[in-house]
Amino acid sequence: MTLQQQRTQEALRALPSAGWVGRRDRAVHVLSQMAGMSDEQIATLTVGDVVIADGAATITAPTGTITLAASIDTLICGPCALARWLHVLDMIVIYPDRYVIDAVVARAAPLSTNSPHLCRGACASTDATRQMPLLPPIDRWGLISAITAQRGHRDSRQPYALRHGGTARAHRPPDTRELLAH
């Protein structure tokens, strides 16, 4: 094992596995360190570019196809980290209510070395999910915009409102009455 591989494994063990932020961070680390992708390459990926099946992750990048094999330890398994992030993205499209996603992710058991591998079977996602960016923008309240998720990958250099004639709806956090109603 090289020093780079050892450091990558140590970082994956140290990264939080709980919550959708932890899942996103682990997925980014896998793509940058295990797959050796640059920030620019990662930014262009869509969910459809990542296929998880039979203990491997196949990433179709502009530079070619990258295959990551599963690890015995779930904490350092790159395909499992990607599968967990893809599951969150699929929930964003299926359940537009943020509270549903938060409840499902919060109830998930924390990762351990004996956690089940999610990469062993096929990781299915909807057609709408496959079109969205693998790392969609997050608004100032920490939410992934449903508009972005449903519209798919766009050129991030041009603001959404400019691409759509200034008709973009702004996301707002729920007010106190909405929070107390749940």
Q: What kind of feature is each model-predicted range?
A:
Residues 1-14, 139-143:
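Flexible interdomain linker/hinge and immediately adjacent N-terminus
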Residues 17-21, 31, 74, 127, ...:
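Residue-level marker of regulatory loop/turn positions in helix-turn-helix DNA-binding domains and
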